[in-house]
């Protein structure tokens, strides 16, 4: 598979086989489906894929396991929410059960949250990174940084260019509605395992 430049994601997992027409753009049909990708911990990320009809055939639609290469994209919903998905550039059938999830991004930090600790004691910070693409469009992706990378993100400036390696994940959380009832929501985000900035070296951050 050919890798992309500043926005590259490879998912290998179990197809949910729930292909549905998503939209028509310039006369080309696009379909959506979900792929289940199991982590080493056993947790399953159910992730949305958008794919052109030109990449689909009967064998792919009926396959149990698929390998998909593409870009993480965002789309603003009419209700104010954001749809985050993998836009497929290439797709292949896996002949046996296999799981893989890797994201490589290069973009610019445009918003940072506050550092905090999880219930398990891990340090975490969330931030938004803008990924440029063709035709002056950008995707604004939510990213989580962990442990030593929390200080790293705190010490670099907004608009800094960063390179990120991690996984595309889904995460359930609960939110109260207007009647006070808890409703399950699903967040889609990038959980980073490695972050590098082109503006700061590690020595500069430690000594600064």
Regions found by a protein language model. Give the residues of each.
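Single-stranded nucleic acid-binding surfaces, predominantly the OB-fold ssDNA-binding core
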Residues: 1-208
